[in-house]
From Swiss-Prot:
Its EC number is 2.3.2.6. This is Leucyl/phenylalanyl-tRNA--protein transferase. Functions in the N-end rule pathway of protein degradation where it conjugates Leu, Phe and, less efficiently, Met from aminoacyl-tRNAs to the N-termini of proteins containing an N-terminal arginine or lysine. Residues 238-247 have a biased composition (Basic and acidic residues). GO terms for molecular function: leucyl-tRNA--protein transferase activity. The lineage of its organism: Bacteria, Pseudomonadati, Pseudomonadota, Gammaproteobacteria, Chromatiales. Its main location: cytoplasm. It is an enzyme of class 2 (transferase). Residues 227-247 are annotated as: Disordered.
Length: 247
């Protein structure tokens, strides 16, 4: 029987167990405890691990099998989303309101009981943003923030953490623009952690953890994209995703 490793909160450079040591039930639970220091968080992402826990719980570290990912060419733009992209007055920016996007993701939702984005998590990812490691895409309508996405970047891999919408399709619009720009910059992997029906409709594929780790390794050798991030003026997300599609 595999036993969970308890991490020492005072040793941020403590190595994680190998991802393949994660439990099968609950799927992917690997370690408990530690802290959310930038050093430990970035070590986790480099090893295919991420934190996910609720209020009142210790920090829980996960590496599920299978893993939900977007790869270049995977993103599916439906007819309705294409119409939204072509007709909407929504505007998309990068890295202009990171804290507001995280707050939007942490806000209560009708279909959820509580939030996993605790105050501790908000502080930790805000610090990563200040260090140039965490990034956001903001979706605006008439000057109001109506949606967004945030996550962590490591060389050629982006690890999506959460997204939110205050109007129909706002998060899809933000995700469409963000992934298009990432592919343009040469990113090789967008990690969604775990798939769900919403993401599956957009093209997320589930791959075995072993394959995920194989794909992560070369992505981590790609060049670093320095902050601040901005969308390229000539970027057309529909054309960019179509260009990446296979025959």
């Amino acid at each position: 029987m595999r036993r969970l490793r308890w991490l020492n909160e005072h040793v941020p450079d403590e190595p994680f167990p190998a991802a393949d040591q994660a439990l099968a039930d609950p799927n992917g639970l690997l370690a408990v405890g530690g802290d959310l220091s930038p050093e430990r968080l970035m070590s986790a992402y480099r090893n295919g691990i991420f934190p996910w826990y609720g209020e009142g719980q210790p920090i829980l570290w996960w590496s599920p099998d299978p893993r939900g990912v977007f790869l270049p060419g995977d993103f599916r733009i439906s007819r309705s989303l294409r119409r939204r992209l072509n007709q909407t007055r929504m505007q998309v920016t990068l890295d202009t309101e990171f804290e507001a996007v995280v707050a939007g993701c942490a806000a209560p939702r009708p279909d959820q009981d509580g939030t996993w984005i605790t105050r501790e998590m908000i502080a930790a990812y805000t610090e990563l943003h200040l260090q140039g490691c965490a990034h956001s895409a903001e979706v605006w309508l008439d000057g109001e923030l109506v949606g967004g996405v945030y996550g962590v970047a490591l060389n050629g891999a982006f690890f999506g953490e959460s997204m939110f919408s205050r109007m129909e399709d706002a998060s899809k619009v933000g995700l469409t623009w963000l992934t298009a720009q990432l592919w343009r910059w040469g990113f090789a992997l967008f990690d969604c952690q775990m798939s769900n029906p919403h993401l599956a409709r957009l093209g997320v594929r589930e791959i075995p953890r072993s394959e995920y780790l194989r794909r992560l390794e070369p992505a981590l050798r790609a060049p670093h994209r320095p902050p601040p991030w901005t969308l390229e003026a000539e970027l057309d997300p529909v054309s960019e995703h179509r260009h990446r599609e296979g025959p």
